[in-house]
Amino acid sequence: MGDIGAPELIIIILVVVVLFGSKRLPDAARSLGRSLRIFKSEIKGLHDDEAPAPTAAVAAAPTQVTGPAPAAPHTPPSAEPATPATGGSGNRSA
């Protein structure tokens, strides 16, 4: 009962052509191909997300805590003081 032969496929193709028309059929096939490509990439992404989960659980295991790391001494950056520009066209009145 579940066997689809050549005559059935021809009937299905004719029904699709009648429903969509010959002009819209290439666009529909292109859209279907894009949708399948996106679907496959999302499924692959789900499988890739599931694989690293066990290694993350191992990395999250508690480790020996030795205390806070010593802070490095704070030295302010040495910068030369800004010198005002001389001459030029300023808004000073003489």
UniProtKB/Swiss-Prot annotation:
The Tat system comprises two distinct complexes: a TatABC complex, containing multiple copies of TatA, TatB and TatC subunits, and a separate TatA complex, containing only TatA subunits. Substrates initially bind to the TatABC complex, which probably triggers association of the separate TatA complex to form the active translocon. The gene is tatA. This is Sec-independent protein translocase protein TatA. It comes from Frankia casuarinae (strain DSM 45818 / CECT 9043 / HFP020203 / CcI3). It comes from the Bacteria. It is found in: Cell membrane. Residues 70-79 have a biased composition (Pro residues). InterPro entries: TatA/B/E, TatA/E. The keyword rRNA processing does not apply.
